[in-house]
Amino acid sequence: MSQPVQTFTPQAFHRQAHDALENPQIRANFRKAMDGLMGKRRKAFDDWDLETLRELGANIRLRALSKLPDLLEQLEANCEANGIRVHWAENGEQACAMITEICQQHGASSVIKGKSMVSEEMHLNAHLEQAGIEALESDLGEYLVQLNEQTPSHIIMPAIHLNTGEISDIMHERTGTERTTDVDAMTAAARAQLRERFMTADVGVSGVNFAVAETGTLCLVENEGNGRLTTTAPPVHIAVTGIEKVVEHLADVPPLYALLTRSATGQHVTTYFNMISSPRKADEHDGPEEVHL
């Protein structure tokens, strides 16, 4: 039977770290996943001069940093002109309060979440739950660790510490699915469980990979399609990001995207690349009625 990990605290970190390092199953799970990921990453840069691309990406980021106050104002102005409502928070606690307030204004009882590391850092789920709002992760790895009452163990692969058998046990124990080691079958079962939740959620919460000041566009990189559903199916979409994600021009995105996909998952392109510039317009049949940043 799968067991939830303890909540990590600064006081207990050393003991918990030693416990994890001494667990041969966790070490084997990490090694298998990381060996595969690093191999894919090396191959993904075969058609690129990595150092040149890295230098280009660094220059784009440094240029944005040198103009950051102006770019943030430009981003806000263009987002607002597009119909995206912009909110500023000084810290995670303020951001959680703002997001909770937006949900409450819409009478929301359920939130579906795309992958967002900043929301993890803010402990957004706990804040929403304290307000009586259910928050469900839709990224497959995040969904699995949430089912097992854990937190993500890796920024790209949240469930990297779990192997196929452990995942099968979690899904069987928490959702009643049949035990299987067939990855496709487990993925299909999770997809079926999540699909209805996308359609019935009151609010969708996502992260942001790039926020383009020039156009007021929010870019979201993903592979599972959950990001697109999170940002289009619920009537309200809330995008959560730190100020470091802003870039000046739309033309700055492709080189950063090339670096991101190859470095993160060893892919030339991800399955989905979403560009969000407004809520649903009068002549459109789908998309959220409100978008908040």
Please report, for each region that a protein language model flagged, where it lies by residue.
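The feature marks the mature, well-folded catalytic cores of soluble enzymes
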Residues: M1-L293
